[in-house]
């Protein structure tokens, strides 16, 4: 086990480039960090162990030893983890780059074997070629990769992932890309590598190679917002942002293929990039569709629909003395935009309900309560129109000129009054609402702070470092830019 880690340790002294690239945290002095009881393969050292969340992408893919290097596969520094990373589509040319990388960093020949034999030959018991002392020579070249699926984008991190484990809680899945290359050609490459090994090590090498190179691929797992760590979220002014650490270098490459070309033909550039790299902290907004869905689910779970039957004039989120309407505790960490939406939505529904249904107190038990929760839960789904229509019909609408209408004469907040006028584009509010108007008002309240159709599916921490640098230069990392205020504000 941990053949890749052992190879990084022993091969680091072969060349100057190896000394820089093969310095991984798993072979350094351990700095204790907390684990998350998620067992899987660390994508940096490839050992099967308990994982913790990465500082760069907030996903659980790094072990408690490698975390101290603060490296991420999304960095633009050409460290070993970055060199083993490719984005889809995977081509034969990209796979050849991985094979060339292994052959360059982990060569197997008679001189290398003699070098390790001299290093190991300290006592009589170590004279014989034994697996326990020469595990670093048993690193076959396979095309297995840990794949992160960010919706339409897939990131492949190639490595030698030994052992077996449940992948239920892992953000990635292991796939085998050998069918995209050439099985017989890869077999020949490995036969040539193992030809210099002693006979007893050859059999172990061959067994390892065929065992892993013929593994079937797993079905890819879509990454969701729940896969990301909450430990690096910062709550400022009731608005969340995420702290991200990335390794930067002044050198740039047009593509990953050009980076590998320089690795083979211009090693000085790679060494210069490694020596001049720096660690930079980005503060990115956390406004995305995944978080909105999570917040909306929490809103629906904590919602107290009894408020629509009450006589409370205070905003729904501030009620603290009423046992039927108190949700103040639920908003302690909630985004202020969600709180604003909750207040306006319940205040509007309260006004409509009290105007049309004979109800006196928030202790009343009404059949309409589940529909209020459904409005929140379906606010960003295709079922919102159906739910709004059900809520409208529950308010005893009457038929007027071939249209169903509900009465509207209950008190509302001045800010909500202004907002409804803006949504309906009218100078004065009518005393009745049609289903179309009722639908427009609820959708206007839901979409006032962010247009769900224009939000990214995942947080910005999944973007490449070059993208984060560009967004920071353009001033677009902060949430103020990404609020995506609806066009209704421009209509005043």
Swiss-Prot record:
UniProt keywords, alphabetically: Host cytoplasm, Host cytoskeleton, Host-virus interaction, Inhibition of host innate immune response by virus, Inhibition of host IRF3 by virus, Inhibition of host IRF7 by virus, Inhibition of host RLR pathway by virus, Interferon antiviral system evasion, Metal-binding, RNA-binding, Viral immunoevasion
Region (Zinc-binding domain): 42-79
Chain intervals for the UniProt region annotation (Interaction with host IRF3): 318-492
Motif pLxIS motif positions after renumbering to this chain: 483-486
Pfam families per record: Rota_NS53 (PF00981)
HAMAP family the record matches: ROTA_NSP1 (MF_04088)
Protein purpose: Plays a role in the inhibition of host innate immunity by inducing the degradation of key host factors required to activate interferon production such as IRF3, IRF5 or IRF7. Associates with components of cullin RING ligases (CRLs) including CUL1 or CUL3, which are essential multisubunit ubiquitination complexes, to modulate their activities.
Subunit structure: Interacts (via C-terminus) with host IRF3; this interaction leads to IRF3 degradation. Interacts with host IRF7; this interaction leads to IRF7 degradation. Interacts with host CUL1 and CUL3.
Record remark: domains: The integrity of the zinc-binding domain in NSP1 is important for degradation of host IRF3.
Name used for this protein in its record: Non-structural protein 1
Lineage: Viruses, Riboviria, Orthornavirae, Duplornaviricota, Resentoviricetes
């Amino acid at each position: 086990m941990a053949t890749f880690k052992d190879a990084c340790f022993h091969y680091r002294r072969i060349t100057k480039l190896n000394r820089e690239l093969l310095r991984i945290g798993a072979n350094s002095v351990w700095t204790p960090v907390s684990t998350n009881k998620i067992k899987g393969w660390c994508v940096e050292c490839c050992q099967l162990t308990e994982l913790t969340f990465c500082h760069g992408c907030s996903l659980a893919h790094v072990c408690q030893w490698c975390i101290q290097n603060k490296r991420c596969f999304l960095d633009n520094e050409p460290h070993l983890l970055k060199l083993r990373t490719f984005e889809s589509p995977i081509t034969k040319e990209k796979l050849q780059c991985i094979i060339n990388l292994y052959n360059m960093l982990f060569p197997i020949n008679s001189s290398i074997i003699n070098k390790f034999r001299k290093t190991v030959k300290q006592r009589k018991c170590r004279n014989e070629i034994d697996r326990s002392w020469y595990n670093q020579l048993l690193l076959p070249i396979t095309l297995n990769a840990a794949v992160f699926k960010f919706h339409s984008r897939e990131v492949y991190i190639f490595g030698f992932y030994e052992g077996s484990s449940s992948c239920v809680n892992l953000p990635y899945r292991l796939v085998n890309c050998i069918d995209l290359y050439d099985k017989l050609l890869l077999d020949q490459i490995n036969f040539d590598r193992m030809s210099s090994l002693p006979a007893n090590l050859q059999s172990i090498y061959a067994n390892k190679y065929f065992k892993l190179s013929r593994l079937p691929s797993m079905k890819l797992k879509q990454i969701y917002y729940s896969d990301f760590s909450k430990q690096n979220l910062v709550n400022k002014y009731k608005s969340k942002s995420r702290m991200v650490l990335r390794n930067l270098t002044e050198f740039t490459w047009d593509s990953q293929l050009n980076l590998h070309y320089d690795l083979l033909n211009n090693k000085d550039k790679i060494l210069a990039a490694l020596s001049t790299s720096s660690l930079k902290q980005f503060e990115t907004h956390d406004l995305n569709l995944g978080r909105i869905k999570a917040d909306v689910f929490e809103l629906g779970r904590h919602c107290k629909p009894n408020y629509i039957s009450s006589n409370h004039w205070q905003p729904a989120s501030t009620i603290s003395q009423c046992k039927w309407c108190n949700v103040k505790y639920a908003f302690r960490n909630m985004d202020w935009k969600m709180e604003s939406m909750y207040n306006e939505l319940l205040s509007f529904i309260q006004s409509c309900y009290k105007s049309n249904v004979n109800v006196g107190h928030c202790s009343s038990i009404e059949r309409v309560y589940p529909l209020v929760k459904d409005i929140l839960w379906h606010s960003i789904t295709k079922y919102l129109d159906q739910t709004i229509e059900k809520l409208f019909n529950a308010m005893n609408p009457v038929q007027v000129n071939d249209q169903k209408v509900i009465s509207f004469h209950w008190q509302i907040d001045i800010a909500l009054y202004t907002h409804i006028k803006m949504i309906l584009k009218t100078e004065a509010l009518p005393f009745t609402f049609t289903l179309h108007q009722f639908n427009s008002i609820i959708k206007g309240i839901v979409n006032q702070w962010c247009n769900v159709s224009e939000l990214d599916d995942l947080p910005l921490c999944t973007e490449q470092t070059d993208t984060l640098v560009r967004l920071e230069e353009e001033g677009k990392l902060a949430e103020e830019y990404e609020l995506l205020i609806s066009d209704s504000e421009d209509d005043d």
